Amino acid sequence: MASSSSDLTLDDHHHLTAVAAASGQATQKLQEFLSRLEEERLKIDAFKRELPLCMQLLNHAMEAYRQQLEAYQMGSQHSAAAAAAARAPLVLEEFIPVKNIGIDVVAADKAAAAGGNSVSSEKASWMVSAQLWNAPASASAADTAAKGPQTPKEHSEHHPLDTSPKLITALDGGGGGGGAFLPFSKDNAMGDGSAAAAAALPELALAPAEKAADAITIAAGEVDKKPYAHDNGVVARSREAQNGGKPPSTPSDGQAVPPPPQPHRKARRCWSPELHRRFVNALQILGGAQVATPKQIRELMKVDGLTNDEVKSHLQKYRLHTRRPMPSPAPPTAATPQLVVLGGIWVPPEYATQAAGPAIYGAHPATQPHYTAAVAAQEYYHHHHHHLQHHPAAAALVHHRAVAPPPPLPPQQQLAPPYSAKSSASARLGSPDSDGRGSGGGGGAAASGAGRDMSESIEEEGEGEEREDDDDDDEMAATNNAHAVDGDDDNDEINTTTTTSAGAINY
């Protein structure tokens, strides 16, 4: 907005005529802009719910152009009055033309200063009214110095769209060349720097310089009255106390603000085993963790520096720990079930106890000695067969002992069941001859009673015994033949033994 001092004079009639013509052209352009914006608004009126921001921007732009159009119309009237006054005799009076911030008006002023021949370039953008392009601060300062002081009314007429104090600070810090898109700068507390900036740019303020200075003083007083006004993230009162009562100083440009020292924090309480033991003893005295209070526990512990909060925190942790279910010990593993031999089968002990009662048939283990004795007898005679062939006297003595008749049975035992006869027969086992003939003599009775009372296992045992007895008979027959051939001296004893054996079998 650079302008010469000739703008303030009244002796240039051509200049006034050019300004009037330029304002007429600007009025026509503004009307065209308004008509175009109205057409655009009608186009998107059906979509105003989907495009609320577009409608808002169009309405604001149209309102701004209407205000400028009114200002131009008022300006044209003032220009006509000024032209009429110029034709009258020269009167020395101060005349300040009404100017606006629009870019088109500035271009018209420049064209009029250059001679009025050039026409300003069109910048058909409704955003001009929002001051997205700002003039340099130096040109504004020069123009302000040329114009001199202004009254609040004139200032409001010259600057209908003034900016806020925050934008003033941003423009001053950025040099005024960044436009609307300026980097963010934090608002510091009111100080000498902001006061100087406000004094350097009085035309950008909302109030005159005197009122602005008073407002700055009042704002500084309010900052002093606030005891906890934050300054750069730190409480001002605490910083003032750290500086010894001095107010916080504003750092110079280019220097980093040193971070404030952190306040000393109290060390965390470390509960040693001894301290915890005292804690547990106090709980036992007071009646448990659910009844005791932190104050009572602290008084009983008698520890210097221990606070109720620390005891309370430890008590809560202790309650949580004791409330947690303790891991139960692992149950003892069940002993390996013992197995008992019952009838040749490995069975659990409970079945053995049930089988301990009276059984219909005899238990199998009772027959085990019979097999062992039979095998032992067979092996014995097999090993000594050759010895008996060469010693007839010893053979006759052994045979006589083996076939000796057993004592007679009592009458009540003569009609015993078949298995008792079987056990008596097994008791008489002494020699192969007696076994064979005894088995042969009682074979009929065993066979007749097997179908009625004997089980399958006892029948199988009887069959095995019969086979063993047959083998023993063959061996004893061979032995008797050998004795008969060896000598005539022993024939009498052999005959006697044979007769005795026959009597035992018949018996």
Curated annotation (Swiss-Prot):
| Localization in the cell | Nucleus
Acidic residues bias located where? 456-476
Q: Where is this region: Disordered?
A: 139-172, 238-268, 402-507
User: Which ranges are annotated Basic and acidic residues under compositional bias?
Assistant: 152-161
The terms under GO molecular function for this entry are: DNA binding; DNA-binding transcription factor activity
Q: Which InterPro entries match?
A: Homeodomain-like_sf, HRS1-like, Myb_dom, Myb_dom_plants, SANT/Myb
Biased composition (Low complexity) is annotated at: 412-433
Record-level GO cellular component terms: nucleus
Coiled-coil parts of chain: none
Q: Which residues bind DNA?
A: 294-319
Q: Which residues form the HTH myb-type domain?
A: 263-323
Point to the regions of Gly residues compositional bias: 437-446
Q: Which SUPFAM superfamilies match?
A: Homeodomain-like
Q: What does this protein do?
A: Probable transcription factor that may play a role in regulatory networks controlling development and metabolism.
User: What NCBIfam families does the entry give?
Assistant: myb_SHAQKYF (TIGR01557)
Q: How does it assemble?
A: Interacts with ACA5.
Q: What is this protein called?
A: Transcription factor NIGTH1
Organism expressing this protein natively: Oryza sativa subsp. japonica
Q: Give the organism's phylogenetic lineage.
A: Eukaryota, Viridiplantae, Streptophyta, Embryophyta, Tracheophyta
What is the name of the gene encoding this protein?
A: NHO1
